[in-house]
Amino acid sequence: MRILVLNWQDVTNPQAGGAELHLQEIFSRIVALGHSVDLLCSSWANVPRRVNLDGIDVHRVGTRHTYPFLAQRYYRRHLAGNDYDVVIEDLNKVPLYTPLWGVRKLVALVHHLFGATAFREASPPVAAAVWLSERPLAALYRNVPFQAVSVSTANDLVARGIRRSFIRVIYNGVDSSRLTPDSAERSPHPVFAYLGRLKRYKRVDVVIRAFAGLNLGDATLEIAGTGDYRAPLEGLVRSLDVAPKVRFLGFIPEDDKIHLLRRAWASVLASPKEGWGISNLEAAACGTPVIAANSPGIRESVIDGETGFLVPPDDPQAMTAAMRGLVQSPELVGVLGAAARKFAETFTWERAANETLAHLNEVVAS
């Protein structure tokens, strides 16, 4: 099968996140199964326009801001003649409206849609543009098969007018052979960790406020990730007088991420909406409980009271209480962590890739 994937970024882009990791893990495995995969994405400064990433032939065009305007033209000039069996729009950020491209077989892969949450991240004009860009989905994509990474995302699509019978839910995976527990690395004092981008809509401020409410002398909060909201978060840390206890690590390599997760008593996530929450599953694979907002997508990657705790969104006090529960009963860290590891082992990238390939074969045969 010859496959073209459209996504704003590839996994090596400095702005890459969970969607790009998902793309790489799934489609590199599909390549390994003997299929051909091209990726059309945006470029950035001082990188080649063509590159091969684990068998995926990557075409880069434009920038993060110009990609949606240039992608269709590049496709028509350079890729349309390749006679792809199926084209996949990894539909995130602003839709590319691929049903208007004249593609024969199309699948829309969705992690999550922004909806009103766009107004928590961007200026009102930009947020309004994102919100409006999602409005035509039901009309333009009404005959397009969808692949969603969670039931929450599928429900969101249905609420927007997509027929449920057109949606296939295929959960993300995690590399449990690389992400493994090591109790010897667990910190003797409470460490809470956030791993992810520092964007306003991620609500890392809730995590910081929750940690500040813990008011425990030997506890620390370690924040790993980059983003344009770091400075305001650092200001919040200073204003709450917890600067000595909060470390901003910036970008950390994969091995350091694993050591951080093993060291932590819990990984903490306060996003009001995610497609799934890959970082939760990575923590679970390392035998680390998760404290997370009971938000769409996220709630499917944590079993409340078994692999961690779900708390009401935008509620620092509830998150503080969950943190305090682990501090007061340290044995819970090991109990929840062991259950989290077993939970993570049920999600593999091999399963996700095979289910995706089966879905694509069904679409091509239809």
Model regions and ranges:
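Membrane-proximal helix-turn-helix segments that form the acceptor-binding/catalytic region
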Residues: P125-V149
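Short hydrophobic beta-strand element within catalytic cores of glycosyltransferases
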Residues: P289-A292, V302
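Carbohydrate-associated surface elements
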Residues: S152, G173
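Conserved acidic donor-binding segment of nucleotide-sugar-dependent glycosyltransferases
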Residues: D304-G305, F309-P316, G325-P330
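Nucleotide-activated donor-binding/catalytic signature segment of Leloir-type glycosyltransferases, i.e.
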Residues: E234-I252
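A short, well-ordered alpha-helix in the C-terminal region of glycosyltransferases
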Residues: A318, G325, L332-T346, A358
